[in-house]
Amino acid sequence: MTIHQLINERVQAALAAAGAPDAPAVVQPASKPEFGDYQANGVMGAAKALKTNPRALAEKVVAALDLAGIADKVEIAGPGFINIHLAPEYLARRSEAALKDDKLGIAPVKPLRVMVEYSSPNLAKEMHVGHLRSSIIGDALARVMEYVGHDVVRANHVGDWGTQFGMLVAYLVETRHAGDADLQLSDLETFYRNAKIRFDESEDFANTARDYVVKLQGGDEEVLKLWRQFVDVSLKHCEDVYEKLNVGLKREHVRGESSYNDDLPVIVQELREKGLLTEDDGAQVVFLDEFRTQEDKPMGVIVQKKDGGFIYTTTDIGAVRYRHRELKLDRVIYVVDARQSQHFAQMFTICRKAGFAPEAMKLEHVGFGVMMGDDGKPFKTRSGGTVKLIELLNEAEERAYALVSEKNPDLSDAQKREIANAVGIGAVKYADLSKNRMSDYIFNWDTMLAFEGNTAPYLQYAYTRVQSVFRKAEDYDANARIVITEPAEKQLAAALAQFEDTLNSVVEGCYPHYLSLYLYQIATLFSRFYEACPILKSEGEVRASRLQLAALTAKTLRTGLDLLGIKVLESM
């Protein structure tokens, strides 16, 4: 049980003893050190409900509150807020236990089978900056959920089916490139652009492309051979991007739209049998009372077009059906642009009505905002084109390399490259993961690569700073007792004890920025501790204790940054 959970439980019991059994404790970390380590603010609401004086109720709660061995001071502030000051000895023992534990003292959870669907690019084209947020937010969530003990299934629901592949096949056959064995992704992109022009301008070409889609769906071996080549070339590119980005998606996590192709007619038939389908202008539509048009009529969701074709909503329904029936998932998280919120809400509703997803299986759309340029518009090249993700990451490394070369010109080129990779890629990722995912944010190289403020370089440097202490300390005792006497020691220890609460918040709300802000707080508090409490210049038990706090700080920073998918360095 975390300190927060423990205090919440004890305050809840005290509220019940004081005559307010249904009142929430509302315990949270103190906003300022002078308010203690935790504040319990539930008395105000309880007093209002009971129509009694909040200060008098607070006195009853404090009298009934049992925090022996946990807090050394509990006081009432203002009209009825309860400030709780943790006992230094209690924090010291918690810190020692966390340091000795591989998981930093995190209690095992009841494991759920959780799928995180993220990245999911359309194939036959290069990944662009629009894929960055889904890839890194989803990866951070998967890492955190796995770390706390859930059974995580990563899913890369790539767009590997549909008209664009018919267009590509038609163009390659027409231009006699269909037998090329060494197709590159850049070739496919060029071919696709040309194929799109032909598709829009020539009815004959468009019909041929559609015929190839039908052949593809029908399992024509020659067309399938070309399709597999397109998919393989595309996925190799994606894997290169994921490796550079330090994202944990592999080939085995790919289950694309094509995987559900054979299920789609069955799904439409099952929807029909359940009385959910209506034919509208030749199309098969599910009308949902829960969603209304501007004319206040039920909104329709097409699942089969009048030409017999299916759309991505049908595929997504098929994926939910498969994930429940075959994978037995407890929770499915879709990390997709916030602008798709209505699509997911409608798709989830259809799945519930059809019985494809029981209420016990949690379906969540984890949306996110847009990455903007300095002009406040979606991030583009200077010419207004789409920025390729690999080019953005390469630029991040080159900018970081220039910074490292300027700060440490004596390092070898290999050392500079290693640092540039960790700092450059880390900077791009952290600039995103440190923001509330629902917010749009401005992409700015200078801000994200700064070694001051809430940035990856600052946190990476904070970690190396702690490690430098241990390189100088020749007599570190990993079993030394922690003794907390100074305010800076206590503030650092109290914050380090909130690691589990922070991860629980990330798991519950799917907000990685909670972890980012926590790590920045730890780095800031360590800096204050380092200045106020000399480590190497102190002696005996004090020195040994402070080295232990430094070790726990390093372990927490390293673990936290790894959960965000950001590399640390032993020196910079």
From Swiss-Prot:
GO terms for molecular function: arginine-tRNA ligase activity; ATP binding. Its EC number is 6.1.1.19. GO terms for biological process: arginyl-tRNA aminoacylation. It is an enzyme of class 6 (ligase). Signal peptide: none annotated. Monomer. This is Arginine--tRNA ligase. It comes from Chromobacterium violaceum (strain ATCC 12472 / DSM 30191 / JCM 1249 / CCUG 213 / NBRC 12614 / NCIMB 9131 / NCTC 9757 / MK). The lineage of its organism: Bacteria, Pseudomonadati, Pseudomonadota, Betaproteobacteria, Neisseriales.
